[in-house]
Amino acid sequence: MKKWLAISCLIAGMTSTAVYADAAKDLQGRLNKVNSFHANFSQKVTSADGAAVQEGEGELWLKRPNLFNWKTTSPDESTLISDGKTLWFYNPFVEQVTATWLKDATGNTPFILITRNDASDWNKYDVRQKGDDFELTPKSASGNLKQFAINVTTNGTIKQFTATEQDGQRSTYVLKNQQNAAVDAAQFTFTPPKGVTLDDQRQ
């Protein structure tokens, strides 16, 4: 009896691993169908008990594998740009720019996951799929990300994604008016404005 139970558990484990792998492969395949796009987005942040923390909106330009311009227009303006090597974060309100190497960006940051769409990143997650919805759970609980969910159509259009942190805070981004077309390279270049403080962490 114990032998059959052990075999059953082994088979179940193998099946589960295969399901996770298939879901991850499907997700990566869908994202690969659209390599550059522009979209508007709305953001809603809620606490663990569901209370509204913040709402916002902005625009997004992306070109895989490593180029993006994430511009938040409300409630406060900020810009996060990757030029392929450096990750620039500009906050006009405090007149500060932070520069870090993109290669040092954590793989458990949802937007970096989407932008890279690299198998080595997805392999760090258990991926479950239900139709166009994909749910990702980190295999390691050492990071701040508890769960990541994304809705991607079969033609590669991202409808929305949600990041849930370890403390239960949830950030949901809904993408609208996505235009799948080439993006001007100028969207992915950044020069710190004169007079701002530069916090250069590329050391």
Curated annotation (Swiss-Prot):
Compartments, as annotated in UniProt: Periplasm
Matches recorded under SUPFAM superfamilies: Prokaryotic lipoproteins and lipoprotein localization factors (SSF89392)
GO cellular component terms given for this protein: outer membrane-bounded periplasmic space
One Pfam family matching this protein: LolA
Keywords: Chaperone, Periplasm, Protein transport, Signal, Transport
A GO BP entry: lipoprotein transport
Gene3D superfamilies: Lipoprotein localisation LolA/LolB/LppX (2.50.20.10)
Family matches, as InterPro entries: LolA/LolB/LppX (IPR029046), OM_lipoprot_carrier_LolA-like (IPR004564), OM_lipoprot_carrier_LolA_Pbac (IPR018323)
Signal peptide extent: 1-20
CDD domains, A to Z: LolA
Task of the protein: Participates in the translocation of lipoproteins from the inner membrane to the outer membrane. Only forms a complex with a lipoprotein if the residue after the N-terminal Cys is not an aspartate (The Asp acts as a targeting signal to indicate that the lipoprotein should stay in the inner membrane).
Subunit structure: Monomer.
Homology family: Belongs to the LolA family.
Protein name: Outer-membrane lipoprotein carrier protein
Lineage of the species this protein comes from: Bacteria, Pseudomonadati, Pseudomonadota, Gammaproteobacteria, Enterobacterales
